[in-house]
Curated annotation (Swiss-Prot):
Disulfide bonds: none annotated. Zn(2+) binds at H561, H565, C665, H669. Catalyzes the attachment of alanine to tRNA(Ala) in a two-step reaction: alanine is first activated by ATP to form Ala-AMP and then transferred to the acceptor end of tRNA(Ala). Also edits incorrectly charged Ser-tRNA(Ala) and Gly-tRNA(Ala) via its editing domain. Its main location: cytoplasm. Binds 1 zinc ion per subunit. Consists of three domains; the N-terminal catalytic domain, the editing domain and the C-terminal C-Ala domain. The editing domain removes incorrectly charged amino acids, while the C-Ala domain, along with tRNA(Ala), serves as a bridge to cooperatively bring together the editing and aminoacylation centers thus stimulating deacylation of misacylated tRNAs. GO terms for molecular function: alanine-tRNA ligase activity; aminoacyl-tRNA deacylase activity; ATP binding; tRNA binding; zinc ion binding. Pfam families: DHHA1, tRNA-synt_2c, tRNA_SAD. This is Alanine--tRNA ligase. It is an enzyme of class 6 (ligase). It comes from Dehalococcoides mccartyi (strain ATCC BAA-2266 / KCTC 15142 / 195). SMART domains: tRNA_SAD. Keywords: Aminoacyl-tRNA synthetase, ATP-binding, Cytoplasm, Ligase, Metal-binding, Nucleotide-binding, Protein biosynthesis, RNA-binding, tRNA-binding, Zinc.
């Protein structure tokens, strides 16, 4: 019997023998692909090859790809659905097509796996007669070949656009006794008799976002076989949780909860959810996903919180997901070593997120049960669902799932309306922007598709030839003064925006014209687009041109880029090796570095990181680059950007001998660290859970920043009439004095308001059988108003108190209702809401106490006079 690890290796070796290059799994975060939330299929990392915008080093490839699909999260817990899974695949980019794909697939399942041919059926796309003929050549009887429509046998695209095509699937037949028993039962029947093993996609088209399809440059092959499903079959198990993939993880869940697997259905469901989601969140975090309110971060948060919820149903009241993740890492790190490498970070992130949700879970569940009890008409309102989401962290899908268990639905339209009120959308656009499909179209229409030769590591000026000119309308022969365009050169000293470093600016000059380069972009096929505008004259295709970059700007960028590399080493020295780069931006003015860390840096940590960088600057260490095989670079421990894809040969940038920093980098740098001159951190902040950001300046900008700080300190010292070094102490004394005076004023206000409150008691009147006290108070703040209302409520015993004042030049209202009157239907929150609306504001609160304010203080008295009409 094959183990799952043996099956994985067996498959990859089989296709290596067929001339395929083994490719490592890419990250669950798709590289440079805005059409996908997460990696959903083995072909995702190869999309540029299928689109024809990049060329693979080997046109035959095979991989075992980590995949994640979000469509069935609520279904996880049954015997079949998973979020995270492994996809075995073999791929041809314009090399072989249907004949070889079908022959090798049949050979593998019948000869390598020894699955009896009589247990196998195949399905094909309706009109794919070619595939049918090829299956027959392999000996598959016509009676076990089934034609199906697009819903079953047309694959893709992975996202809203991309490669796609008809497909053919291999199915395993468990036997007539396992299904519906009908004589005409075939793989289109959902009775459970048949199990899809392998999907062979014949990639022929590129589909755009509108659904329009165009033929790809060369037909290709994309196959996918789920390792988990294959393991079930080869280990003769009922479901994936009984295979060696999940058995150790299920065992850990049983050990933690004291429950047994296989005893009752509800316990099994909870154990499966906890185990499957633990695996999913472990891989997501290891691949760089961070819990968030949107996007892939929301998927992670949703999984983690669903796991916690079902853990509670197993009696797991204390945090348990760190232990579960440990079991996942122990089981899978032999195949995916990044799990071991990032274990500390993964576990810390899980602990933090689980603790955050645990704080609100119990209260949220109590509120949800109350909502369920009070819900009439069978539907929980969107407003209630939003409150559970916004206040208690309940993903709406989780609320929907719990509601369904109670026979209720959720008003998702109302929930979305509430979300829209809160949601802010940031959009950015560029005149020249390229998504996957648009890039393919631009490259296809170029007259010159060869890679631009970058000479900018050595040169800042270069004689070149204009190979192409692109405008919004496509390629043109010439451009004139005022025209905006992108110029393609055969050789260029301009660095194209990549790896967080901004593109170079400068000029392209010909005998007849001058072109200002405002930015330089890098297309997937290696072509550089020099974007800008014609300043004077005319530029034409095939002209010789002098390309000049802005050298001073380049030097500023180089200072910041090299400093970024040293900073990453500094952070690992100060905070620990678990620090991972999560992004960077390098501009002439400053650098921005995002990294994984769960808490704010202390002042001491910031100072130590800064001192580390400046020490390396003072040492004037050599900065040098060399090319080497990617595998050698990893063996040497060179730092690679998390989630980035690299070719077989890479450029390694080192600082110092021996190196204090060694990273894969294609950017431009100083030649010695001393050229950076000075490094200064200007801010350290949070940009999300477990994600920190440092902004820093170097060189001239650092000097300017320090000068500004010194000027500010000098001005402050003058105002305090103290020496600069004495200013902090002087300021602290002044603040203490102000705080003391504030307390004195508050005490005086409190005494005055108490006296005023005593007088107010006599103004309480009987109105509709209740005691009502409505009054405007002067010279009190909101806190004092609250204390006054407490005093009046205690003295009245029973009644409604409405007080108003002007605080910070705005009207402020406070209402209290005693318990006996709440039972009669009076509600402080409703009263304050109406008062605040009169004054141009808003407010509300609980039945017993509420407060609110407005914008127009002139409306204060009018609002108070309207109280009786509200009762």
């Amino acid at each position: 019997m094959f183990s799952s690890d043996e099956l994985r290796e067996n498959y990859l070796k089989f296709f290596e023998e067929k001339g395929h290059k083994r490719i490592a799994s890419s990250s669950l975060i798709p590289h440079n692909d805005p059409t996908l939330l997460l990696t959903t299929a083995g072909m995702v990392q190869f999309k540029p090859y299928y689109l024809g915008v990049a060329k693979p080093e080997n046109s035959r490839m095979t991989s075992c790809q980590k995949c994640f699909r979000t469509t069935d999260i609520e279904s996880v817990g049954d015997a079949s659905h998973l979020t995270m899974f492994e996809m075995l695949g073999n791929f041809s980019i314009g090399n072989y097509f249907k004949k070889e794909a079908i022959a090798w697939a049949w050979e593998y399942v019948t000869q390598r796996l020894n699955i009896p041919a009589e247990k196998l059926w195949v399905t094909v796309y309706l009109d794919d007669d070619e595939a049918i003929a090829l299956w027959k050549e392999q000996g598959v009887p016509e009676g076990r070949i089934v034609r199906l429509g697009a819903a079953d046998n047309f694959w893709g695209p992975a996202g809203d656009s991309g490669p796609c095509g008809p497909c053919s699937e291999i199915h395993y037949d468990f036997g007539q006794e396992m299904g519906c028993g009908k004589a005409d039962c075939n793989p289109s029947c959902k009775c459970g008799r048949f199990c899809e093993i392998w999907n062979l996609v014949f990639v022929q088209f590129n589909q755009d976002k509108s659904g329009k399809r165009q033929n790809l440059p060369a037909p290709s092959i994309d196959t996918g076989m789920g390792l988990e499903r294959l393991t079930i079959l080869m280990q003769f198990r009922k479901n994936v949780y009984e295979t060696d993939i999940f058995a150790p993880v299920i065992e850990k869940a049983c050990q933690l909860s004291g429950r047994q697997y296989g005893i009752d259905a509800e316990t099994d469901k909870a154990l499966r959810i906890v185990s499957e989601h633990s695996r999913g969140i472990t891989f997501l975090i290891a691949d760089g996903v961070i819990p968030d309110k949107a996007g892939r971060g929301y998927v992670l948060r949703r999984l983690l919180r669903r796991a916690v919820l079902f853990g509670r149903r197993l009696g797991l009241e204390k945090p348990f997901l760190v232990d579960m993740a440990g079991a996942v890492i122990a089981r899978m790190s032999g195949i995916y070593p990044e799990l071991n490498k990032r274990q500390a970070y993964v576990l810390e992130m899980i602990a933090s997120e689980e603790a955050r949700f645990s704080e609100t879970l119990a209260t949220g569940l109590e509120l949800l049960e109350e909502i369920v009890r009070q819900t009439k008409g069978g539907q929980i309102s969107g407003q209630d669902a939003f409150k559970l989401y916004d206040t208690y962290g309940f993903p709406v899908e989780m609320t929907t799932e719990i509601a369904a268990e109670r026979g209720l639905s959720v008003d998702l339209g109302g929930f979305e309306a509430e979300m829209e009120v809160q949601r802010t959308k940031a959009r950015s656009s560029r005149k020249f922007s390229f998504d996957a499909a648009a890039t393919a179209e631009a490259v296809k229409n170029m007259r010159h598709g060869e890679k631009t030769c970058f000479v900018g590591y050595e040169l800042t000026r270069q004689k070149s030839t204009i190979m192409d000119i692109l405008t919004e309308g496509g390629s043109v022969d010439s451009i004139e003064e005022g025209d905006e365009a992108s110029i393609v050169l055969d050789e260029s000293p301009f660095y194209a925006e990549m790896g967080g470093q901004v593109g170079d600016t400068g000029e392209i000059i010909t005998g007849g014209g001058r072109f200002e380069v405002k930015n330089t972009l890098h297309l997937p096929n290696g072509v550089f687009l020099h974007q800008g505008r014609v300043i004077s004259g005319c530029l034409k295709i095939a002209e010789t041109a002098a390309a000049h970059i802005d050298e001073e700007r380049r030097r500023d960028i180089a200072r910041n880029h090299t400093a970024t590399h040293i900073l990453q080493t500094a952070l690992r020295q100060v905070l620990g090796e678990q620090v991972q780069q999560r992004g960077s931006v390098v501009t002439p003015e400053r650098l921005r570095f995002d990294f994984s860390h769960l808490k704010p840096m202390t002042k001491d940590e910031i100072r130590r990181a800064e001192e580390f960088v400046n020490d390396k600057i003072r040492r004037n260490l050599p900065v040098y680059a060399e090319e080497m095989p990617y595998r050698h670079a990893l063996e040497e421990g060179v730092t690679a950007l998390f989630g980035e894809k690299y070719g077989d040969r890479v450029r390694v940038l080192r600082v110092g001998r021996p190196a204090v920093s060694a990273e894969l980098c294609g950017g431009t740098h100083v030649s010695a660290s001393g050229e950076i001159s000075l490094f200064k951190i200007v801010s350290e902040s949070s940009v999300g859970a477990g994600l920190r950001r440092i902004e820093a300046v170097t060189g001239r900008e650092a000097e300017a920043y320090i000068n500004l700080q010194q000027d500010s300190l000098s001005e402050l010292s003058g105002m305090l009439e103290a020496a600069p070094e004495e200013s902090p102490r002087k300021l602290a004394e002044l603040k203490e004095e102000i705080d003391t005076l504030k307390k004195t004023v508050q005490n005086l206000e409190r005494q005055m308001s108490r006296g005023e409150a005593e007088e107010l008691l006599s103004k309480a009147e009987d109105y509709k059988g209740i005691k009502l006290l409505v009054s405007r108070m002067t010279s009190v703040n909101a806190d004092t108003l609250h204390e006054t209302a407490d005093f009046l409520r205690d003295k009245l015993g029973s009644g409604i108190i409405v007080l108003g004042t002007v605080s910070e030049d705005k009207p402020f209202f406070l209402c209290m209702v005693t318990p006996d009157l709440i039972e009669k239907g009076y509600h402080a929150g409703n009263i304050v809401k109406k008062l605040s609306q009169i004054a141009g504001g808003g407010g509300g609160g609980k039945p017993n106490m509420a407060q609110g304010g407005g914008r127009d203080k002139a409306k204060l008295d009018e609002a108070l006079q309207a109280v009786k009409g509200m009762l």
